[in-house]
Regions:
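Single conserved hydrophobic/aromatic residue that forms the stacking wall/gate
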Residues: 141-150
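Hydrophobic alpha-helical membrane-embedded segments
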Residues: 26-39, 113-119
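Juxtamembrane helix-capping/reentrant segments at transmembrane boundaries
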Residues: 50-73
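Alpha-helical transmembrane segments and their immediate juxtamembrane interface regions
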Residues: 104-135
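Helix-coil boundary and interhelical linker segments in multi-pass alpha-helical membrane proteins
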Residues: 16-23, 89-97
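Membrane-water interface of transmembrane alpha-helices
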Residues: 36-49
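Juxtamembrane inter-helical linkers in multi-pass membrane proteins
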Residues: 48-55, 132-138
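Hydrophobic alpha-helical transmembrane segments of multi-pass integral membrane proteins
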Residues: 2-12, 29, 70-84, 105-115
Length: 150
């Protein structure tokens, strides 16, 4: 059996089991890559703008931390999927049937929005004009995220 057949079978299986979340995970992965690359580019621009300040510029430590954070996103989404599965399986015992739940879907969309805002912030760091209202939304999101992290 060829690798293409195996990959096609796996994609079909995951698509059937995860539904729309499968496609959103694909979009999230693309956003994660774009965010990482735009963060590297923004750091490079800042290093050029501040050549004498070592606090600016790309850092492998920050890069590794960013990758670890993105992997942690996937872990949290996996936990949401497990909780969805448990709710679906136990709902029948409780006397009602749920065809699916949305916890993993909501978590995935939340992380997609987080990545999109981060890409926007990176564009602003590179000097791209960003609408003021969008930066306000981004700042509000950042403050809420910091509050949740504490």
């Amino acid at each position: 059996m060829s690798i293409q057949v195996c990959v096609t079978g796996l994609v079909a299986y995951l698509s059937q089991k995860l539904g729309v979340t499968f496609y959103l995970l694909g979009i999230l992965l693309c956003l994660m890559v774009i965010d990482y690359l735009s963060g590297m580019a923004a750091s490079a621009v800042e290093a050029l703008d501040h050549p004498d300040d070592k606090s600016y510029g790309w850092s492998s430590r920050k890069g590794a931390k960013g990758i670890a954070k993105k992997v942690a996103y996937l872990f949290v989404i996996a936990v949401g999927m497990v909780i969805d599965y448990v709710i679906i399986q136990t709902s029948g015992v409780l006397g009602f049937n749920l065809p699916n739940t949305m916890l993993s879907l909501l978590v995935t969309v939340w992380y997609m929005l987080n990545e999109a805002l981060s890409i926007t912030e990176n564009a602003g760091r590179m000097g791209a004009p960003v609408p003021e209202w969008l930066m306000t939304v981004s700042y509000t999101h950042l403050r809420a995220h910091e509050t949740l992290s504490d």
